[in-house]
């Protein structure tokens, strides 16, 4: 790179440097970058000027540029846009959080309250048969989840009644009176646990360990 000579007879000109095919001119006026066109060896190269500032601000002064202009341009490819869409979908799925413990409680708590009402409210005395509505609820919503449901039902259900447990006189439970007259007790707690395991298999064990204290084993 060589410094071009400046004739003494000409007016004071702004110094400039010439480096191969590019000419850089420095003056009080806005900076211009000259890009020769055509053959770089031509004696009279044609140039184009690219104006970079209109107010004479210094090069590299970030205050003279907007923050957006200083950012490196980003070209969004089709793959990156697809990845962003997948991330947004994952985030939206994460927002839809489900508290499974509350979900299980919403189902089981009303059933437990219903059975306790039958056993302990005084509505039914020992050996009383359940009302058709209460009996239907027990048969449809609890009994099918007992681990030995078919064995308990046997030849078929005649009706369901309330009475004292044969092994624990202070405890009341429900009994199935079969069509052949045989009476069989069943644990509603086993029905509740079976319901949880059937409907919520992924969360059943942890839920049962947390909410069910160890109980005396009923038949």
From Swiss-Prot:
GO terms for biological process: chloroplast organization; chloroplast rRNA processing. Disulfide bonds: none annotated. Residues 79-96 have a biased composition (Acidic residues). Keywords: Chloroplast, Plastid, Transit peptide. One of its GO terms (molecular function) is mRNA binding. InterPro entries: DCL-like (IPR044673). Residues 1-48 form a transit peptide. Expressed in leaves, stems, flowers and siliques. It is found in: Plastid, Chloroplast. Its main location: plastid. Residues 70-96 are annotated as: Disordered. Pfam families: DUF3223 (PF11523). The keyword Metal-binding does not apply. GO terms for cellular component: chloroplast. Required for normal plastid function and plant development. Required for correct plastid ribosome assembly. Required for processing and maturation of 4.5S rRNA. This is Protein DCL homolog, chloroplastic. It comes from Arabidopsis thaliana (Mouse-ear cress). The lineage of its organism: Eukaryota, Viridiplantae, Streptophyta, Embryophyta, Tracheophyta.
């Amino acid at each position: 790179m060589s410094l071009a000579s400046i004739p003494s007879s000409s007016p004071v000109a702004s110094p400039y440097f010439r480096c191969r095919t590019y000419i850089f001119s420095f003056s009080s006026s806005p900076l211009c970058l000259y890009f020769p066109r055509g053959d770089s060896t031509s004696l009279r190269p044609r140039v184009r000027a690219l104006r970079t500032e209109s107010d004479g601000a210094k090069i590299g002064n970030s205050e003279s540029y907007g923050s957006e202009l200083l950012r490196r341009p980003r070209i969004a490819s089709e793959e990156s846009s697809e990845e962003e869409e997948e991330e947004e979908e994952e985030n939206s799925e994460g927002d839809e959080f489900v508290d499974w413990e509350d979900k299980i409680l919403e189902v089981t708590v009303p059933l437990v309250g219903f059975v306790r009402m039958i056993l302990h409210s005084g509505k039914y005395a020992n050996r009383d048969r359940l009302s058709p509505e209460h009996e239907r609820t027990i048969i449809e919503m609890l009994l099918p989840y007992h681990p030995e449901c078919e064995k308990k039902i046997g030849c078929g259900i005649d009706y369901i009644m309330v009475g004292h447990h044969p092994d624990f006189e202070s405890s009341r439970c429900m009994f199935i009176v079969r069509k052949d007259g045989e009476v069989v007790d069943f644990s509603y707690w086993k029905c509740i646990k079976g319901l949880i395991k059937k409907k919520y298999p992924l969360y059943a064990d942890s839920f049962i360990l947390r909410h069910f204290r160890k109980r005396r084993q009923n038949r």
